[in-house]
Regions:
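Fungal secretory targeting signals
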Residues: 1-18
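Alpha/beta-hydrolase-fold serine-hydrolase catalytic core, especially in secreted/extracellular enzymes
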Residues: 18-105, 111-116, 280, 288-290, ...
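Structural recognition of the beta-strand scaffold that forms the well-ordered cores
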Residues: 120-123, 136-141, 197-199, 219-224, ...
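Cap/lid segment of the alpha/beta-hydrolase catalytic domain
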Residues: 123-187, 227-237
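Flexible loop/turn segments at secondary-structure boundaries
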Residues: 129, 145-147, 205-208, 228-233, ...
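Extended catalytic-interface subdomain
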Residues: 178, 199-201, 223, 261-298, ...
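Primarily recognizes the serine-hydrolase "nucleophile elbow" in alpha/beta-hydrolase
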Residues: 179-244, 269-271
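Mobile cap/lid helix-loop segments that gate and shape the active-site cleft of serine hydrolases
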Residues: 220-281, 304-312, 318-324
Length: 389
């Protein structure tokens, strides 16, 4: 049921990177008691539960470190040298590090009815949802970064070496970060780097979610039908599979795909031992506050509709604690065309684009599903939303 409940607040301020240099790093060995429920995003590994909003940046950094260590591999910082050149609609980005050089090119499609500098959406591969004529499209061939047909192949590894532990998902997020670097360096591209979104569908829906979680300069993420590692949680997917419905699980996803670090395979048969789940990736959008609209499909069991709903609901609890619940939307609609876009989901897509990219005073308190599954949040969440001062 579509709900527009909370009072409308002002638009997000421009994203400003947070200084996490004084935050503790992860210990070399982590002891975490097996937990079948979703871990508490407000409970750091070695500290009491959060009581203030000012404590969140270090917990956020800890979650990012956990995701990189256990699942995605390390995302390097900006390379020591980065340049950009614009030729027509092609923006070429060249990165140099430790004597190695790599270049990749994205394609710009500028708005037909707007004033520069324009907001833009980075589309993994190609956009599979409608982008309005007032917003630019940046087409990003993310699979150039990391090939699907062999680990350690692709432009990212040309720069950082074939043995780098990053999987394909985090290499693509690194590329998104570099695209924004290039936009900042290239005013002639006519793109406003402070109003950039990201989208993708299916495996690229996972990628878009991960990019927004790791790149604070992304103003809006629009992941579409990404299933687990985008909307859904590994713990819930395992239970769905155990109950007889075929769904994408952690155990399955590491077989043949190079999207994740090789370290993830150590944990896929013991998911309750992970000190995180994907609801905590959603929480990374909460501060600095950025838009996240998860677009999902209840007609495809493999996407794990129940997991997607429960996981996202748990993730939104972090937004609620930080006072930005309406920045995170969820829309789940039944249709048979994977990566198609039903008209029923257009109102929420329009609302999120208007608010986070076009600067309009639009209500984005959207949380809806046409799923008939039982909604029992206590089955997965044994913690509450803290009152953070």
């Amino acid at each position: 049921m579509l709900s527009f409940i909370l009072p409308l607040l002002l638009l997000a301020s421009p994203v400003i990177g947070q200084n996490t240099s004084t935050c503790p790093t992860l210990p070399s060995a982590i002891t975490y008691a097996s937990n079948a429920k979703l871990p508490d995003p407000f409970l750091p590994l070695a500290s009491p539960r959060l009581t203030t909003k000012s404590q969140w940046p270090c917990r956020k950094e800890e979650i990012r470190q956990l995701l990189q260590r256990y699942t995605y591999g390390q995302m390097p910082p900006k390379p020591s040298s980065l340049t950009a050149s614009l030729s027509g609609t092609s923006l070429t980005i060249t990165a140099k590090e430790a004597g190695k050089t790599m270049s990749f090119t994205v394609t710009l499609k500028l708005p037909t009815s707007a004033t520069a500098p324009y907001p833009a959406i980075i589309a993994y591969g190609a956009a599979s949802l409608p982008i309005p004529s007032t917003v630019a499209t940046i087409t990003y061939q993310n699979f150039e970064m990391a090939a699907d047909n062999g680990r350690g192949k692709g432009k990212f590894y040309d720069l950082y070496g074939a043995n780098h532990n990053a999987g394909g998902m985090i290499t693509a997020a690194w590329g998104v970060d570099r695209i924004i670097d290039a936009l900042e360096l290239t005013p002639a591209a006519k793109i406003d780097p402070k109003r950039v979104g990201v989208t993708g569908c299916s495996r690229n829906g996972k990628g878009a979610t991960i990019a927004g979680a790791f790149v604070d300069r992304i103003a809006l993420a629009l992941p579409q039908e990404g299933g687990q590692a985008a909307a859904g949680c590994w713990r819930i997917a395992d239970e769905i599979q155990k109950n007889g419905t075929k769904v994408e699980t952690a155990h399955q996803i590491v077989n043949g795909d190079t999207w994740f670090s090789t370290d993830f395979s150590k944990y896929v048969d013991a998911v309750p031992t992970l000190p995180w789940d994907n609801h905590m990736m959603h929480a990374l959008y909460a501060d600095p506050p950025r838009g996240l609209l998860i677009i999902e499909n209840t007609a495809i069991d493999y996407l794990g509709p129940t997991s997607n709903y429960h996981c996202a609901t748990a993730g939104r609890m972090a937004h609620e604690a930080l006072g930005v619940k309406h920045y995170f939307g969820f829309s789940q609609n039944s249709h048979s065309d994977h990566c198609g876009f039903p008209k029923a989901q257009q109102p929420e897509l329009t609302a999120f684009i208007e608010r986070f990219l076009l600067g309009k005073d639009t209500n984005t308190d959207v949380w809806k599903t046409d799923g008939k599954f039982v909604i029992d949040e206590k089955r997965w969440v044994d913690w509450s939303v803290p009152a953070l001062s």
